[in-house]
Amino acid sequence: MAKGGAKKAAAAAARAAANRMLADNRQARHQYEILETLETGIELVGTEVKSIRNGKANLRDGFCLIRNGELQLHNVHISPHTHAGNYFNHDPLRTRKLLAHRREIDKFRGLVDQKGLTLIPLSLQLKGSWIKLTIGLGKGRKLHDKRAAEKEKQSKKDVKAAMERY
C-alpha cells in the first residue's frame, strides 16, 4: 500500500511541476483594469523555449496587436539562450504570433477597436509541455483610480488581519 501512495504523490508532484508560472506581469494589473482574459498558445523557436523555462522572460513592456487577422505579441523580451551560439540564437524582442481561435480574435478585435481598450500580456505558464500566454483586455487606469484600488486593497487586508486576530 505504501508503494501505491508514493506513486500517487510522485504523480501529483509531477503534475504540479508541469503546471507552473514562468513569468508574470504584475505591473499590468496595477496600470490597467483587466476586463477579460484569454489563454493563448505562443509560437516559439527552440532557444526561446529553453530561455522561458529558465525564467528569462520579461512581459513588463509587452503589448498585443491584431494584424491581418492574427494576434501578435510585441516588445516582450526573452533573453538569448546561454548555451547556444550567436548563429542559432533568437532575436530577444522579435514579434511572436499568438495562437487563438478565429472567433476569439474577432471578439477581441471588436472590443479593442470600439472602446479604445488594449491587449496586455499578463502571464506565461507551463501547461504540461506547452507554454501558454494569458492576455488581458485592459482599460488604462488614471492616477486617482490607482490610488482608490490601492486603498481598497489595503482595507481588505486590514479587515482580514482583524478577522484573524478574533
Swiss-Prot record:
HAMAP family: SmpB
Any one Gene Ontology cellular component term annotated for this protein: cytosol
Record flagged with keyword Cytoplasm: yes
Main location as per UniProt: cytoplasm
Family matches, as Pfam families: SmpB
Protein name listed in UniProt: SsrA-binding protein
NCBIfam families: PRK05422.1 (NF003843), smpB (TIGR00086)
Family: Belongs to the SmpB family.
UniProt KW keywords: Cytoplasm, RNA-binding
Organism whose genome encodes this protein: Synechococcus sp. (strain CC9605)
